[in-house]
Amino acid sequence: STLMRSSAASDVYKRQTDAAQSAAELDAILERGSVNIYMFHGGTNFCFMNGANDYDKLTPDVTSYDYDSPLSEDGQITPKYEAFRNVIARHAPIPEVSFRTDIRQAAYGALCCDGVCSLFDALDVLSTAHSSREPRSMERFGQGYGYILYRTMLPTAMEVSSIELTKAADRAQIFIDGVPALTLYDRELSGAHAVKWSLPQGAQLDILVENLGRVNYSQKMMQQRKGIDGAVLLDGQALQNWQIWTLPLESGALKQIGFSPLSACRQPAFYHFALDVQQKGDTFLDLSGWGKGCVFLNGFNLGRFWNVGPQQRLYIPAPLLKDGVNDLVVFETEGFSANTVCFHDKPELRL
């Protein structure tokens, strides 16, 4: 029979283990049977494919799936690999394998932003607005991943004491006339929230909702619609007549964004960088000082970042780079931009 020792995918970085200890455990298992090493090579959850777990609250996975595996995220042989190989060799013949891949790493240093564009200014080049009496989830528009923006104008002036979003997931940022007013995440989206807003007639209400990753097991799989699939209630009154922009942020749409000279922006925004590469190598993009969002290199979605950690740097394999100027676009949603990024030759996790 096959014995299997594994761990859940959540809290990956809390499950790092000593190579010698892991090798001893592997040896004990092989004394009695077979083993399935999960993960042997974790790799990277590029794009919006990180997924999530649910333990009475949403726990999205980060972009890196390194998992403290025998092979690192960027394909490096680790001490754990060597220790495992030595153990397995005591139980079964292992052929000699010559590793020919030369993994070149590069630290391109700091880079300054050369242009910015507010999401609200880019909506109509990123997507075509849908008109709907009620809010609808992104799946109802054929959208699988990314963000979705809901907009309505208040028909009358209101003194608002509570707001409630029903059937909403995963993270909603609420703006009044372009100014951030409230952010609700996961369980905060259940029930009404006290506010104190004096809203004039015609005030513009925007709600940007992010799909942080779908749960891929258990009964929760049937509850994975993202966006708002119910109603937006102000003091119990449902708002109607919405304009809805689906924002999967695919490469073709990103190319249409027009950037302006850098200026302070408290709204969700796109920041452009030009990286000149003379010699390609694997590199790690550090986003210290930034808030939350995702990054695109030459139109390819490198994944998500969030200043809550633990991941501090995004892995960029050398084949994603091109000789000469590379276009890097950071989409940041919190209004926290450092205006610089830095490329290192090593990853960094802060546990």
Q: Which ranges hold each PLM region?
A:
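Carbohydrate-binding surfaces of carbohydrate-active enzymes
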Residues: S10, A28-G33, I37-I244, L249-P261, ...
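Single conserved hydrophobic/aromatic residue that forms the stacking wall/gate
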Residues: S1-A9, Y13
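Terminal leader/tail segments of proteins
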Residues: F284, L314-L351
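Extracellular Ig-like/FN3 beta-sandwich strand-entry sites
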Residues: P200-Q204, K280, D323-V325
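Short beta-strands within extracellular/lumenal beta-sheet-rich domains
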Residues: G144-M153, R266-D276
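Aromatic-lined ligand-binding clefts that engage carbohydrates, nucleic acids, or primary amines
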Residues: V160-I176, L275-N298, F305-W306, L328-F331
